[in-house]
């Protein structure tokens, strides 16, 4: 399957492709939940390394833009590990995404949170904790 076709896959189709890729290489034996989670953390850490110590929002945006290819690669790796974790846990990523969207629409109604943060410790609103 070409890269251009991968861009048009649903998350569930992506999951199936990752599963096939892994099975062809007999890598399932290495894909325990702990190591998959550590893989996600590692990839997030690689993104963190791009922006660490910088506080200025404009500089942060610039460094991310200047390193867009690296950021894209790390985000792709995160999705890869998430697909492996979802496959091993029998979770359909399309369904999981739909559920979280529905949950967050109820949890954060536009009328309550538009242009407001949701950090309860700083006075934000979150219906889950009210």
Walk through the language-model features, giving the residues of each:
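Flexible "arm" and connector segments at domain edges
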Residues: 1-75, 79-130
């Amino acid at each position: 399957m070409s890269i251009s076709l991968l861009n048009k896959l649903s998350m569930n189709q992506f999951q199936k492709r990752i599963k096939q890729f892994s099975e062809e290489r007999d890598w399932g034996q290495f894909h325990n939940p702990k190591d998959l989670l550590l893989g996600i953390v590692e990839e997030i850490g690689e993104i963190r390394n791009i922006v660490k110590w910088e506080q200025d929002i404009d500089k942060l945006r610039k460094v991310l833009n200047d390193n867009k290819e690296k950021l894209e690669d790390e985000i792709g790796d995160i999705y890869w590990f998430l697909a492996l974790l979802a496959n091993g846990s029998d979770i359909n990523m399309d369904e999981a995404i739909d559920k979280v969207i529905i949950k967050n629409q109820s949890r954060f109604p536009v009328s309550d949170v538009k242009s407001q943060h949701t950090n309860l410790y700083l006075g934000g609103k979150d219906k889950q904790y009210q």
